[in-house]
């Protein structure tokens, strides 16, 4: 079971329609050496803005895991959905929002990776490129 936060609210789409976006899902694992409260605060309170500022995202949804409902997934402590333009699949400048500036791309990449390393997201991270659909249930 997860909680949901939307620091950067994704654009609305019609029921059942695909969003015009690359939706990257990132499955985060907390390092065993880092207390849960510290990890959660570092991810939600510090890293969030770094991720938004260093990537070309137009939707950013965080899902802290509050309870594991099945066996086998207990090491995942957070799930992030980041929305990018479709061009971000093949263009690093679109992915990082660097506008074609190589130095800016490198600065953004380094800043993001340093931030990820601080709370353990530089290791054991699973990324799944996918699409975003919303359905009324």
What are these regions (language model features)?
Residues 1-137:
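Macromolecular interaction modules
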């Amino acid at each position: 079971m997860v909680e949901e936060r939307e620091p950067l609210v994704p654009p609305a789409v019609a029921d059942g329609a695909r969003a015009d976006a690359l939706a990257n899902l990132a499955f985060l694992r907390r390092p065993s050496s880092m207390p849960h409260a510290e990890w959660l605060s570092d991810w939600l309170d510090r890293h969030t803005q770094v991720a938004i500022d260093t990537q070309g995202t137009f939707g950013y949804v965080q899902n802290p895991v509050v309870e594991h409902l099945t066996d086998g997934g207990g090491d995942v402590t957070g799930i992030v959905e980041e929305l990018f333009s479709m061009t971000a699949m093949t263009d690093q400048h679109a992915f990082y929002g660097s506008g074609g500036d190589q130095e800016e791309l490198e600065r953004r990449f380094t800043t993001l990776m340093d931030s990820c390393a601080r709370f353990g997201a530089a290791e054991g991270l699973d990324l799944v490129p996918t699409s975003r659909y919303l359905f009324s249930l």
